[in-house]
Amino acid sequence: TNPNAIVGLTEFMADTKLSRKIELDFGHLFGKWEKQTELIVFNPPWLPASYDPEGNDEAIYYNENLFPDFFEGAKKRLLPEGKLVILFSNLAQITNVTKDHPIEKELTEGGRFQLEKCLKKTVKAASEKTKRDPHWRSSEEVELWVLINI
């Protein structure tokens, strides 16, 4: 519900060929899109919220319904054998915010998708100038999940 991503992408695409092939919509999860597709890419917030996030906090924290709502909506909108590509992180687990991993939970309990692959990349060390405590940074991994509609 923050339009900055749409504004930024619109400016980035400008008058490129992409701008003629991609239609953007500002809305919750799938917005106005109902038509089935072969690919859905999702870059959700990486930390569960302990309160109801608003504004810029929605880019960092997700509420308890985000992932169940997303997976339910994705199932309806993916063609048979269509793919979900999800960018995520183990940040919530290594900082002990939660033990639950929403993508792993969906694969275990949801019965809607099958894992094709999960690629992980270690995050670079934080700058020595940072004031945040980066002791967990060496354990952080960014994850790229590819799930297939079953």
Describe the function of each predicted region.
Residues 68, 81-89:
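Conserved beta-strand signature within the Rossmann-like core of class I S-adenosyl-L-methionine
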Residues 3-5, 44-69:
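Mobile active-site "lid"/loop adjacent to the S-adenosyl-L-methionine
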Residues 70-74:
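Class I S-adenosylmethionine-dependent transferase superfamily signal
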Residues 10-11, 52-55, 97-99:
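Short amphipathic alpha-helical segments
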Residues 46-47, 89-94:
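Short "lid" loop at the C-terminus of a central beta-strand within the Rossmann-like core
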Residues 18, 78-80:
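Helix-to-beta-strand junctions that scaffold the AdoMet/dcAdoMet cofactor pocket
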Residues 94-150:
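Class I S-adenosyl-L-methionine
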Residues 1-42, 48-49:
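Conserved SAM/SAH cofactor-binding pocket of Class I
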